[in-house]
Amino acid sequence: MSKNIVVLPGDHVGKEVTDEAIKVLNAIAEVRPEIKFNFQHHLIGGAAIDATGTPLPDEALEASKKADAVLLGAVGGPKWGTGAVRPEQGLLKIRKELGLYANLRPCNFASDSLLDLSPLKPEYAKGTDFVVVRELVGGIYFGERKEDEGDGVAWDSEKYSVPEVQRITRMAAFLALQQNPPLPIWSLDKANVLASSRLWRKTVEETIKTEFPQLTVQHQLIDSAAMILVKSPTKLNGVVITNNMFGDIISDEASVIPGSLGLLPSASLASLPDTNKAFGLYEPCHGSAPDLPANKVNPIATILSAAMMLKLSLDLVEEGRALEEAVRNVLDAGVRTGDLGGSNSTTEVGDAIAKAVKEILA
């Protein structure tokens, strides 16, 4: 059983965290000899700009199109600024070219032992468990725009079509139906102001009503949802669906609840994972952390992204769950990087998780 994975380390800590994810995947292959992971490394982001002049070289894109999944580290940094050619353009391009229309970002505690690290009081944070499903290839980030050309005027445009909203709604519904009873769906918009949000709300409502009558959907204005998230996040438990820009913002807000950006994974999918073989790109929610010393970054977000990859793209559900259990066991044992109040290095955390997952699967 051979699985082809393109690795895009990216910039700064990107290589460190992807190295640790590869380490734990190889540990799984050691105890499951029928599984073989083939890793192919390519450039993206600032590293690609330095080497080739473009944030996403053609060979990286073509290799990604042929892979079973893509594992990405982190992109960007102050070195490359905000000029005409920027590292982040590589991310936008690969999402669009690979049709990665749905971004999944879980918000929960990898271990309850981390509750005291949350900026929220434990009694409010405990039990938080939702996934943000963000539409990733439409909306204002891909709309028509005008730069300031000396006239002091610039603008961006938000545009959504019914098929785009239906597609992301079906992804949210699929995820909700994976639990028994099904999870509630929360749809976030700004329908009291924006025409695109009114189309969004209408389409989400009709899609759920006609295609998934067993599910419930509740609509929430994005600003109200942002308040709920810091006041009582468990009220949003279930599946949270929203557009590209709102999803970008609300998922970053949610990411601090578990106490560290170094804990949260993400998946960007091109299709429903109904056979556990959806093509996807997996990356941590944190950035490239250019100021962080070597061997200090928390690799858990990337390792948990690899666990999502095992479950959603590589049809290795048991192994993915084992990896999540290994992470929980290691955290409970107190093996932690500095962002979690520990003193362990990046490689020490990776080593501990690799050992733990082998013990679970042996």
Swiss-Prot record:
GO cellular component: cytosol
UniProt KW Membrane keyword: no
Biological pathway: Amino-acid biosynthesis; L-leucine biosynthesis; L-leucine from 3-methyl-2-oxobutanoate: step 3/4
GO terms of biological process kind: L-leucine biosynthetic process
UniProt binding sites for NAD(+): 77-88, 287-298
Co-factor binding comment: Binds 1 Mg(2+) or Mn(2+) ion per subunit.
Chain sites annotated for binding Mg(2+): D223, D248, D252
GO molecular function, one term: magnesium ion binding
Alphabetical list of Pfam families matching this protein: Iso_dh (PF00180)
Residues where substrate binds: R95, R105, R134, D223
Keyword NAD included in the entry's annotation: yes
Residues the record marks as site: Important for catalysis: Y141, K190
Main location: cytoplasm
Subunit-structure text: Homodimer.
Family: Belongs to the isocitrate and isopropylmalate dehydrogenases family.
Name the UniProt record assigns to this protein: 3-isopropylmalate dehydrogenase
Organism: Kluyveromyces lactis (strain ATCC 8585 / CBS 2359 / DSM 70799 / NBRC 1267 / NRRL Y-1140 / WM37)
